[in-house]
């Protein structure tokens, strides 16, 4: 029996997207500005999307590669990333309003995101549109989507309860106001909504403030936000972490919300595995990470990209700084194989090495 030819997982993904026959492919990733941007975050939220978007463009497709930065979230960081005193003072405050933890930048978000932005060119990331959730919440499309969720809150509560198992109270309003006084966006509560004037009446347990805010000043419950972003941004492809992939889990609940509440089809998805350090998943807020902007100081950017592309998205990857020389050697070997200097006995392994080397070099070795 003739063996099937090797097809790289990036190309398999592209072929699936081509079969959808959409006018424009909107390839989306998300980045939580909760702490340092580590290399683990970029596996499934940046490099996977970049490879797929690039190949689609090469095939003549209209493509938009997006990266959503979650700036409308509350501060959740904990020691050792921050001091207990800093955590006590700022926990629950919208991260855009949290000061720089080192006093060197304008705010928390800039402190962690600017180093990431500065090295994108070195990693060959081109044609990337970066948008923040704060900007999205100001848009007319998002405000209308918030109003839809408020109007259909009973149905939304039923869907969330079906998947999450949590019961929301009868007076639940799926909108978390941003307190204009202390910038709390974690424990505030909307107690009434005026849809005509697009305002929510709120109470803030953190500082005791009460009043009204516009629907552009706050955020949705995160599962509703996820589905809302699909709708507002017209997302057609979006990978997601394996923690969301379990049957009946968070992505399934968002799919149901998209279809049953918003009346849209969810984007094609792809689960990916985290990157680990010493058996623990890399975590910005928990301080277990290797910063993305540090990588070009110790190895070629293509080395990291090759590691991610030669491995299938759900492959468990264990990282240590001591592993960098090995990863560099593997990339150098792939280069020799690609240019015919070295041979590999197993055809599929050789084909994977060659194709992954191409992708790591933006299809232009």
Regions inferred by a protein language model and the residue ranges of each:
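N-terminal catalytic cores of NTP/NDP-binding nucleotidyl/phosphoryl-transfer enzymes
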Residues: 1-83, 227-248
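Residue-level signal for inorganic ion chemistry
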Residues: 38, 149, 300
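Active-site cores that bind ATP or allylic diphosphates and position pyrophosphate for catalysis
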Residues: 126-293
